[in-house]
Amino acid sequence: RQSKKEMDKKWSELAQKMGTMAEDLVAPSVPRVLRQLANCSEEQLEYVAVRAKKRNAKTNQIKEFDVIVVCGDYLLVNETKSTLVPSDVDQFVVSIPEVRDYYPHYAGKKVIGALASLYVDESLVRYGEKNGLIVLGTGEELMEILNSPGFKPQEF
C-alpha cells in the first residue's frame, strides 16, 4: 500500500514537471504572437509576466497566470496545458473575463485569450477558434498560431 502512495506521488510530481516544461517552452513565444496579431511593435510591449501571481482586489483570492502580455490596445492571457482537452477550452473561456479583476489598471485594454499545448488535435484547434481563442501549438517558431487565416480573436 505504501508503494502505491509513493508511486502516485511520483506520477503527480512528473505531471507537474511536464506542465512546467510545457509552460517554459511556450512562454518565450507569447509576446511575439501578440505583436504579430495586434500589429504591435517591440517598443509598444508594456508588460510580460510568466507565472504571474496576482491578487483579486475584490475577493482577495490569489491566482497564477501562465503568461500575461500587454501590448498596444491588448492584454493577452495565455494558459498552457501539457495535454489539451475540450473541457480546458470551456473552463478557460469562462475564466478570461476575470483577468480584469486581477489587472484592473489595464481596464482599457481588450482582453484576448490563448491556449497552448505542444500538440493540439485539429478538432481542438477548431473548437478553440469557435470559442474566440488563439490556439498555439508547436511549429517552425516553436509556437505558432494555428487558427484559420484572417481569424480575429474575440475581445472579452
Which stretches of residues belong to each language-model region?
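Charged, alpha-helix-enriched surfaces in structured cytosolic catalytic cores
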Residues: M21, L25, I62, S87, ...
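Active-site metal-binding core of divalent-cation-utilizing nuclease and nuclease-like domains
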Residues: E42-G72
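Arginine/glycine-rich "motif VI" loop of SF2 helicases in the C-terminal RecA-like domain
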Residues: E98-G108
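A short coil-to-beta-strand element that immediately follows conserved catalytic motifs
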Residues: N39-V48, A107-V111
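Domain-level recognition of nuclease-like catalytic cores that cleave nucleotide substrates
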Residues: V111-F156
